[in-house]
UniProtKB/Swiss-Prot annotation:
GO terms for cellular component: cytosol. This is Elongation factor Tu. It comes from Aliarcobacter butzleri (strain RM4018) (Arcobacter butzleri). One of its GO terms (molecular function) is GTPase activity. The keyword Transcription does not apply. Residues 10-212 form the tr-type G domain. Belongs to the TRAFAC class translation factor GTPase superfamily. Classic translation factor GTPase family. EF-Tu/EF-1A subfamily. Residues 177-179 are annotated as: G5. Monomer. Residues 136-139 are annotated as: G4. Mg(2+) binds at T26.
Length: 402
């Protein structure tokens, strides 16, 4: 059976839901999908389909990132539902890197919570450029002091966004109930609650600009996952960071071990074949003569000769203060945290510049890092620094040394 062709008739934008566990991120994702399907046509994805990663079943919390697609009148969106639980922030770092903008979900019954802060901070660190806010669970507020509560929560949110250098005063904030909107849409209507979801997506359409894609640069795609398809070969999935890729083009697989060359035999997006994949697309790339065990998450697919694996670099980093959830104590030369780059984490040891004895939480510092394994790096590559399951800093590669 021939696959349906992917049509590119609207601008494409990657967004996602972030926020505290149980504030309604997945319900909102389902509500957006359902309301837009009723209003503009398209496939409705229900809550279970979105909340469908295998690990979650046991604990009732979202761990893996779930990708769905939907359309407004103006745009085609790929939406990633980000993990909410603190233990799975690692996944948020890899998931949030896939966003041109985010919808921050906050329960108006609770206001901002610990993970709300952590996700805003992470968004800043991993370079999510725009945030739109949805104040959820409006239907659960006492009608008598509802307006006052919403105003209070809104004020808190704006202050919090400004604290992390997002434009708190200008951020669109829409109140509603994802659950009620979803119920209306399931009954085939866009009712008063559904209209609030439409208003939210209008704000997303207007406020989150269509990103300038890095189409003209050399092809680069971080590997997120690798599958074996019987009779067809090995498929690598990820989001193309730069450039374009067509069937028949040669690429290199870079990182960890030896660099390998191969040829692209297929490009697909949402199970539809494409003539070419381009920057910003989440897609699957079929590779000739490559076994599943030859590729792993954390490597990158690149245009031959454009990027090489490195272990040593100079970087500019910001170390979080204790108040921001960072370390409580300083660190010294020889400190060995994990460096999260694109889709991978690698241990590295830090060397402080001469004359700098230690780095205090809240400091900005330039240091040299040597990784235990080579990964694809270039100047400007961003990373997070983590230790013992929490983010302690963020940085950017200033210069490659080796």
């Amino acid at each position: 059976m021939a696959k349906e062709k992917f049509s590119r008739n609207k601008p494409h934008v990657n967004i996602g839901t972030i926020g505290h566990v149980d504030h309604g991120k997945t319900t909102l994702t389902a509500a957006i999908s359902a309301v837009l399907a009723v209003k503009y046509g398209g496939e409705m994805k229900d809550y279970d389909q979105i909340d469908n990663a295998p690990e979650e079943r046991e604990r009732g919390i979202t761990i893996a990132t779930s990708h769905i697609e939907y359309e407004t009148a103006k745009r085609h969106y790929a939406h990633v539902d980000c993990p909410g639980h603190a233990d799975y922030v690692k996944n948020m770092i890899t998931g949030a890197a896939q966003m041109d903008g985010a919808i921050l979900v906050i329960a108006s019954t609770d206001g901002p919570m610990a993970q709300t802060r952590e996700h805003i901070l992470l968004s800043k660190q991993v370079g999510v450029p725009y945030i739109v806010v949805f104040m959820n669970k409006e239907d659960q507020l006492d009608p008598q002091d509802k307006e006052e509560m919403l105003e209070l929560v809104e004020m808190e949110i704006r202050e919090l966004l400004s604290t992390y250098d997002f434009p708190g005063d200008d951020t669109p904030i829409i109140a509603g109930s994802a659950f009620q909107a979803l119920e209306e849409a399931k009954a085939g209507a866009v009712g008063p609650w559904g209209e609030k979801i439409v208003a939210l997506m209008d704000a997303v359409d207007e406020y989150i600009p269509t990103p300038e894609r890095d189409i003209d640069q050399a092809f680069l795609m971080p590997v997120e996952d690798v599958f074996s398809i019987s009779g067809r070969g090995t498929v690598v999935t990820g989001r193309i960071e730069k450039g374009t890729i067509k069937v028949g083009e040669e690429i290199e697989i870079v990182g960890f071990g030896d660099t390998r060359k191969t040829t692209v035999t297929g490009v697909e997006m949402f199970r539809k074949e494409m003539d070419q994949g381009q920057a910003g697309d989440n897609c699957g790339i079929l590779l000739r003569g490559i076994k599943k065990e030859d590729v792993e998450r954390g490597q990158v697919l690149v245009k031959p000769g454009t990027i090489t694996p490195h272990t040593k670099f100079r970087c500019e980093v910001y170390i979080l203060s204790k108040e921001e959830g960072g370390r409580h104590t300083p660190f010294f030369s020889g400190y060995r945290p994990q460096f999260y780059v694109r889709t991978t984490d690698v241990t590295g040891s830090c060397t402080l510049p001469e004359g700098t004895e230690m780095v205090m939480p809240g400091d900005n510092v330039e240091m040299t890092v040597e990784l235990v394994a080579p990964i694809a790096l270039d100047k400007g590559t961003k990373f997070a620094i983590r230790e013992g399951g929490r983010t302690v800093g963020a940085g950017v590669v200033a210069e490659i040394i080796a």
